[in-house]
A protein has these predicted regions:
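Long, low-hydrophobicity ectodomains and other hydrophilic envelope-associated domains
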Residues: 1-275
Length: 275
């Protein structure tokens, strides 16, 4: 296992290369300990700040198939930032080492951490579509106004491609930051009030499905645009689940744009899909 850490505020960096014993039960805790110890040795603080973190885990199945989990994210906390850093890495290591499907031989783990004291965070204030009428399959530009911490507001433009199967009529879109969960509360409330479309019968999930969940999970530094409701029966039928996990995964139309900072907040817009 190799861990590289940079404290950008102090201009200090360091790394550690450690050989881990082959023990599925202990692998997650060893990964957590090596990461945390390396970070604390270089950063030498327990305060707040922003962390950029990326990692990859390579493994091999019993049948010789190559397995890879690769992930990056950003975190911010006003205190205890170091304890947040290894959570996703430990989750990924736990999946590979202790999954119920098959034995995975993990042979490489790499992690890179960059820490800073500044809060690299901006909140979505508003969102405005550049046009109010779009066609199915057309790309829609959305201007998103953001308020950073103790700085002037600015605007970023993100793109959303209208699903080809989207029926004519009003289409509500939710524009949110990857670190925001306020939209989730509103969605669950709306589902309770309006009823939830019938879902497909859940399919049996495989290890590859769980790996894909980690590799494709939302990042805190993304602006995410998704259809805010599922009035279209064709799209609703594609949802295999209607609970919290499915809401977090979003609809098949969800699209993401990566930013160089953590994005919080949410905004809703409405456009007309024409025939």
């Amino acid at each position: 296992m190799y861990v590289s850490v940079t404290d950008s505020s102090r201009g200090v960096n360091g790394s550690a290369r450690t050989e881990l014993i082959d023990d599925d039960a202990l692998l997650p805790s060893m990964v957590d300990a090596v990461t945390y110890n390396t970070v604390t040795r270089v950063a030498d603080r327990e305060g707040g700040g922003t962390a950029r973190f990326n990692f990859r885990i390579d493994g091999r199945s019993a049948g010789g198939e190559q397995i890879k989990i690769q992930r990056e994210n950003m975190y911010y906390a006003d205190a205890g930032i170091l304890k947040m850093i290894s959570q996703e890495l430990v989750q990924a290591a736990t999946l590979l080492a202790q999954n119920k499907f098959e034995k995975i031989d993990v042979y490489n783990i790499e992690a890179n951490v960059v820490l800073g004291t500044e809060p690299e965070v901006a909140e979505i204030i508003s969102a405005r579509p550049q046009k109010l009428n779009v066609r199915a399959g057309e790309e829609l530009a959305i201007d998103v106004e953001l308020q950073p911490y103790r700085a002037e507001k600015f605007t970023r433009t993100v793109k959303f491609t209208v699903p080809k199967q989207q029926r004519p009529g009003k289409m509500a879109l939710n524009v949110r930051g990857g670190s925001s969960l306020a939209w989730m509360q509103e969605l669950m409330k709306r589902q309770q009030e309006e009823g939830i479309p019938a879902a497909k019968k859940p399919q049996r999930r495989t290890l590859k499905d769980f790996i894909a969940d980690i590799n494709n999970a939302d990042q805190n530094n993304e602006i995410i645009v998704d259809i805010a409701a599922l009035p279209d029966p064709d799209m609703a039928a594609q949802q295999q689940d209607t609970g919290f996990a499915a809401a977090l995964a979003g609809t098949p139309a969800k699209q993401k744009t990566t930013m160089n900072f953590i994005v919080d907040g949410t905004a809703d817009i409405m456009v007309e899909v024409t025939g």
